[in-house]
């Protein structure tokens, strides 16, 4: 990939982050949703290898005795921009509908190739499966939102 194209991608990413900051000033995160941020799913120190967990602070009697269905949120952005924080209000809404939500960060083009992004997501799913079973989640009932 040429440097000119890479620079266009970096500019789009910077513009997106500025727009996200303005949007976040107008929105309020709900008090009844717990947000656990920046859990590393790989121990390599990259911010791109973290995930957030969203779960409702209010557990209904029905939910108390069953494992919660899971949504894995993978932010959009054409593989070149975006971040897991962009969808935090959406993830909170999903929690209110009875899901536990994992929002995954991954490396972006042009800093990596598409295959690397697939590997990031695969490693995040492995981490969730191996390490976060204490969240009362139902692994047989997983939906991925891209």
Q: How should each PLM-predicted stretch be described?
A:
Residues 8-66, 118:
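N-terminal cap/lid segment of alpha/beta-hydrolase-fold proteins
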Residues 57, 78, 108-110:
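Feature marks short, surface-exposed loop/turn motifs that line or immediately flank catalytic pockets
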Residues 144-146:
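Short beta-strand immediately N-terminal to the catalytic nucleophile in serine-hydrolase-like folds
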